[in-house]
Every structure is written in C-alpha cells, then in structure tokens.
Amino acid sequence: MTEEKTPKQIVELLDKYIIGQNEAKKSVAVALYNRYRRLQLPKQMQQDITPKNMLMAGPTGVGKTEIARRLAKIVDAPFVKVEATKFTEVGYVGRDVESMVRDLVEEAVRMEEKEQFDRVKLQATKKANNRLVKLIVPGIKRENRENSMQQMMQMLSGNFNMNQAQDNEEVTDDIRNERLSVADQLNKGLLENREVTIEVEQAPKVNPMGDMMGQMGIDMSSLMGDLMPKKTVKRTLKVSDAREVLIQEESKKLINYDSLYQRAIERTQQNGIIFIDEIDKITAGNKKTSGEVSREGVQRDILPIVEGSTVSTKYGPVSTDHILFIAAGAFAESKPSDLIPELQGRFPIRVELNALTQEDFVKILKDPQNSLLKQYIALLKADGIKLVFTQEAIDRIAQIAFEVNQGTDNIGARRLATILEKLLEDVLYEGPDMNMGEITITQKYVDQKLSDIIINKDLTKFIL
C-alpha cells in the first residue's frame, strides 16, 4: 500500500468507475487508509488494532462488489469474492469457510509471481534466446555409458532436466559460427515464424484426492513431484511462441519460491481483502426447512475467520487478524440484525447503498472510465464504424432501464447491459459487412427497437 493514496484520493479514483454511493466510498477509503496508519505505530500497538470490517446493505446492481473490487486494484491488494451461500457447515459435504483464505493466498502468490516474472524477464529472455539458438543449431551429441547411467539416476530422483542433454554435445567451429549467425537473426526478429521442437514439462493431471488435500492445507502435487520424475512432452511451435514458453521456464529457475511464498503470506495478512457476498441469505430471517443445512452454523464457522485465527495453507500458516472483510447483501427479506450477535459485532461499519435513479443511469452510461457506451464504441471501431449516441438516446435508454427495473426485478445497473445488447444486436451482427462510416443512435431508433418489448410485460421479463 502506498503513502500517497489518502482517503480523499482513494475516493477520487473510485469516482472514475462508480457513480454515486459516496458514503460507501468514504467508508472503504477510511478503512483501507487505517491499515497504513496502523503500520506507522509501534509493533506492540499494531497487534491490538484490528481492521474495521464493513457490512454493505443495498439492492443488487448498485455497486457493492465493484467498490470492493476497484478498491483492491487501486492499492494492489490481494482480493477474492466469495458467496456465503456456497459454504456449508462443518461436517457437511461442500466448501469449508477456510477455503476463502486459501483462495486469497493463491491470489497473493499469483500477484507476487507476476511481479517477480517482470523483474527477471530481461535475464530470462536472454537465457531463452540462448536455448532457442541451440535448438535451431544443435551440437553433435556424444553419448557414453557414464553419462547414460548418471542421467538414469537423475531421472529416478526426479532431478533430471531434459535440457541437460544439450550440455553433452560437441560444438565445432562451424556450429559455433552458425549459432552466432542465428543469434543475430533472432535478435533482429527474422526467425519468428520458423518452427522449433521443444520439450516442456507436462501439466499434472487433476487429482480429486489432491484437491481434498489442498483444502486441508496439504500440497500433494508438491509432495509427489519431489518423489516422481518430471514428465516432459515434445511440442512444435513457432519461435515467437516457443520463446514465451522458455521464458516462463527460465523465469521460474531465477525466482526463489520459498521467499516468494513468504512475501505472499505477508501480503495476504497485511493487505488482503475478502468480499463475502449474499451474507443476507444465511441469516435467520430467511425461511429454511428442517432438511436444509443450518445457515446459522455457516455464520458460526465464518466467525473465527473474521474474528482472527490461523488457517493452514499449502504455503504455510496464515493469520486472518488483519485481513479486511467486507460483507454485502440485499437484505430484502431480512435485516443485518438477523445475523448472529457475535458476527454483527465483527462488522462495526454499516453502510446502506441507495437504489439507482434515472439520473444515475445516465451518468453510468457516459461518465465512468470505460463505461458501457465507450465499450460498444470501441468494439465497433474495430470494424471501422464510428458509433455515436445522441443525448436524447442516452436519456431514453436510462429511462427504459429505470422503468423496467421498477416494473420487474430491480437488478440495478446490470439492466443497462441487457438493454444495450438488445438495442445494438443488429449493428453488432451486421457491422463487419457494413460500409457505413458512422452510425448515430437516436431516440427514435431506441423507441423502434425497444418499444414493443416494453409494452409487452411478458416480453420485458423474458428479454430485458
């Protein structure tokens, strides 16, 4: 997390993507900045300051998930979204609540790995190009009994690398000169479409037993990988594609994964964000039959994770003491007070998000960075078509979205995507074959395409 991003700056960045909901934006910005404040305190006091977890209540499609997702991107924090209804009480078949922490660690590992790949890419590319040169211009193989026995022992121990075979070769002056020539051509990009055959490590098969062990924090693939020799397969690829594969291989050799995993765990513990959606669906306010899994039991399983506990993962133990939890739900048939009291107390910040108005829809269509209209304009630009929306057309689209939400299920801003897809289906279908340089979407066109559907309520429910 960076010093520069104050709560006000975080809100300004969120404003680029999310319309309205200022109270929610302020709350998440303050909760996030409090992490930075905590890290400035003495170590002893840091342990006593817990994150101010948040409970968002509001109808679907008003920006609950988007606020949390954008927040994580802004501060480059590990982020996972889970649905409370997917978890089952301990003792039942299904996902256990600790899996959300394991998913978060996996995301942190992926982020750390990407950063390390970027750091070593130059060095890995150089090594990959050297390997390509040797593949294009192979040396003269020299086999002897001692080397064969040594390779067999390495294969049995799982340490044999097929690329080691290149070391057991004789390089004459002619081969050396040809390799210099090929290296020069590679650097100039003259051999990108030439095909080469490379040996790559075979992806391990998915093992259901291994997945179960992973849920218990045991990495079976790593344990078995140390005992069994690594299998390789031959693939014929273009030089440009082969280089990418080899860069990945060489990058992994240059990275200290033990150190990477430790950083990923620390990143998870200090910066991780877990978004628990549909938490209202596991409250006592939702009717349940005697045959259903106890939803209150799921709440009690979630409680120690949110409260602060240690979860075993295949990368090591992870403390959840300072992970930020954001829970969200529509609470249409229940209320936050229907949660068990202990869990309520772990979400001290309560934010209510407002239903979107017609004016909000107009802003959502136009204002955000990469808004829906900007996305469709960019898509059709690929066909050489300039797509233009008049202000009257935008107002009419917003009005239709608002009215359909009022008359049927209110799905918030998601209604706009459905309406635009129906409105532009002919243009998107015929676009590649049209020679028109510009298409203007007017209010009249919007009414022509959508009026019949809006009048017929049954069609509205089915299509929009």
Swiss-Prot record:
Compartment annotation: Cytoplasm
Cellular component GO terms, alphabetical: HslUV protease complex
Organism listed in the record: Lactobacillus gasseri (strain ATCC 33323 / DSM 20243 / BCRC 14619 / CIP 102991 / JCM 1131 / KCTC 3163 / NCIMB 11718 / NCTC 13722 / AM63)
Similarity-based family: Belongs to the ClpX chaperone family. HslU subfamily.
Alphabetically ordered keywords of this record: ATP-binding, Chaperone, Cytoplasm, Nucleotide-binding
Gene field: hslU
Protein function: ATPase subunit of a proteasome-like degradation complex; this subunit has chaperone activity. The binding of ATP and its subsequent hydrolysis by HslU are essential for unfolding of protein substrates subsequently hydrolyzed by HslV. HslU recognizes the N-terminal part of its protein substrates and unfolds these before they are guided to HslV for hydrolysis.
Protein name in the entry: ATP-dependent protease ATPase subunit HslU
NCBIfam families referenced in this protein's UniProt entry, alphabetically: hslU (TIGR00390), PRK05201.1 (NF003544)
GO terms of biological process kind: protein unfolding; proteolysis involved in protein catabolic process
Main location class: cytoplasm
InterPro entries in the record: AAA+_ATPase, ATP-dep_Clp_protease_ClpX, ATPase_AAA_core, Clp_ATPase_C, HslU, P-loop_NTPase
Subunit-level organization: A double ring-shaped homohexamer of HslV is capped on each side by a ring-shaped HslU homohexamer. The assembly of the HslU/HslV complex is dependent on binding of ATP.
Residues where ATP binds: I19, G61, V62, G63, K64, T65, E66, D277, E342, R414
Any GO molecular function: ATP binding
